[in-house]
């Protein structure tokens, strides 16, 4: 049985508290670039980056894949049922402390097992939520967001809010109702809706309009219930184009924003954008961030990376400095993420089965984003790309371009202008020069 909070089991005993030692350090259990108290711009790194550990990949994953059995035997796995759930809480808060992360995130079924009935399941959840709340009282860690797992249990074979079965819709509503109560209880700064199985495999058996309408009804019910109980955290939707269904309804940032506007939900939701999901959608991560940012929907980030050579969600820890730099470039221009953060929705590789690998992985991701933050800040401070972009679009600052921007032009006036100016001269986009500059900043800042 898991020990009480007064007689804790020690986990990660080979790991001391991870400290910043600088880029010259050879210590694999130290930060090289992430210095939480270092000021970048007008805030500390800790304030700018708002790192979060994902409960599911870190404390429940066992390395199972479609081709093989579990490879990861964690110290807490000797327990089962509710004892296992309690042991995971102990392990989680010890790792939070050792990595000095300010936030964590979870699905409801990550922290507590399902019972034979919804009532029993909720009772299990209440026990663990109370335990987590007690641990939070003596910890600096906060809940970035929680969400509902409405994709693992076979009842969700056809989806949850988009299921063809009204009984499933009702069950999903009850589950999210409990999730919102949990969010309020633990002070979650956000609540996430991930599509899970909200999509379809073939139109031959799908009433697409009804499913989308029902999804919107479900979201509105969530908004209404949050207001009813006084939960004021930010609602977030996490886009994904495919997997597990062939066509997920929240395909990408643009699709999801369109859905929110179509159903009048745009004032209640922002987006939680994942790098690997951008890859699956055929976009760069910075594209998704930019689309959300310029429309006012950038809320939070699931920090990971995908493998462009593979067609599935690999959820690797983020180590690509180009990606972290360009991501932070967007986030800084957004004025930060507000109540959102950088949640490591990432898992160690199946062959990285030792507990220390969990620490190495988070250090790598935190260092990569710390480096990206500093480079992005310097790029913005020097107006490297802004000056070039301003010059590239200079034709819209006066003359016919200004008339277009101000809405004073029409097809008649534009035709007359074109007839009088038949010689058009374009300028180079200078992509290669810009990439060389980006390289220089990444290498030198």
Swiss-Prot record:
It is an enzyme of class 5 (isomerase). It is found in: Cytoplasm. Mg(2+) 2 binds at residues 274, 277, 313, 315. GO terms for molecular function: magnesium ion binding; xylose isomerase activity. Its cofactor is Mg(2+). One of its GO terms (cellular component) is cytoplasm. Mg(2+) 1 binds at residues 238, 274, 302, 345. The keyword Isomerase applies. The keyword Flavoprotein does not apply. It catalyses: alpha-D-xylose = alpha-D-xylulofuranose. Binds 2 magnesium ions per subunit. PROSITE patterns: XYLOSE_ISOMERASE (PS51415). Its EC number is 5.3.1.5. Keywords: Carbohydrate metabolism, Cytoplasm, Isomerase, Magnesium, Metal-binding, Xylose metabolism. The active site is at 107, 110. It comes from the Bacteria. PANTHER family: PTHR48408, XYLOSE ISOMERASE. HAMAP family: Xylose_isom_A. Belongs to the xylose isomerase family. Homotetramer. This is Xylose isomerase. It comes from Bacillus cereus (strain ATCC 10987 / NRS 248). The lineage of its organism: Bacteria, Bacillati, Bacillota, Bacilli, Bacillales.
